[in-house]
């Protein structure tokens, strides 16, 4: 089970000797001309504060403005343009209208210059180093189990009977309801291995898979069901856990916070939406802003030193040297048949 597999990584110290720095990276996704770039800036600064040894790649759609791309590059991100991926028949009412564009996330399986990547949504903040997750055994898909208790899940049988995998003994799944649902992860954070063959198969499977309310999250859960390994909630705290399953949350141990609840995006926060006036929410919003506003974490001002395989590598100096040499630029991924 997952705890044993997970333990193999948590016991690792430093970087695996056989892995080079360049073979691993974090990756996020950005689309449109809105304000989500602020979340990505906060994310890369959070990774920097946590002294991550790996870069953040931003997979952005063509509609991301040049101005926003430049901001991200100036913060040390690697900006990589991708083409959109759409479901075959857009006839489904998605839980949120903007979910349909998230199928484009599938493009990150094309990033085969990296042997392993950790995907993080742009509304996530990393408060502690999670580089050890790269040392999890290959061949599996690692992510945190989701919570079924919010109204966005009202279309599901789990929600209708009050069942949640975060507390499966509270309301049990009885035989008369049919087969027990498979474990279901939140796709805002996951550990995966890029692969062109996997990417091609993802697209082929997508063509014959009817869209569902949670778009690419449902699709990824279906596709990786047999190789999914849960990791602790500390690696992707969905804010609803604070009021739905507080017994499962220890904020002092949480490493990654996912600001996905309505009204919780720190850069848009007003405190007026339901549950947003909670003291724990206010604290987490402040923690995000403390990182975002910290000028010492800006890329040009960063003195972060990363532990490499044999010694220390200064991330800032390397990236600046690459930039001066003209190596850091937009990378356009090859188009694939849709």
From Swiss-Prot:
Keywords: Carbohydrate metabolism, Cytoplasm, Galactose metabolism, Glycosyltransferase, Manganese, Metal-binding, Transferase. GO terms for cellular component: cytoplasm. It holds the Pfam family Glyco_transf_8. Its main location: cytoplasm. Its EC number is 2.4.1.123. It is found in: Cytoplasm. Gene3D superfamilies: Spore Coat Polysaccharide Biosynthesis Protein SpsA, Chain A. One of its GO terms (molecular function) is glycosyltransferase activity. The active site is at 105. Its cofactor is a divalent metal cation. InterPro entries: Glyco_trans_8, GNT1/Glycosyltrans_8, Nucleotide-diphossugar_trans. GO terms for biological process: galactose metabolic process. Mn(2+) binds at residues 121, 123, 258. It catalyses: myo-inositol + UDP-alpha-D-galactose = alpha-D-galactosyl-(1->3)-1D-myo-inositol + UDP + H(+). The keyword Cytoplasm applies. Belongs to the glycosyltransferase 8 family. Galactosyltransferase subfamily. Galactinol synthase involved in the biosynthesis of raffinose family oligosaccharides (RFOs) that function as osmoprotectants. May promote plant stress tolerance. This is Galactinol synthase 2. It comes from Solanum lycopersicum. The gene is GOLS2.
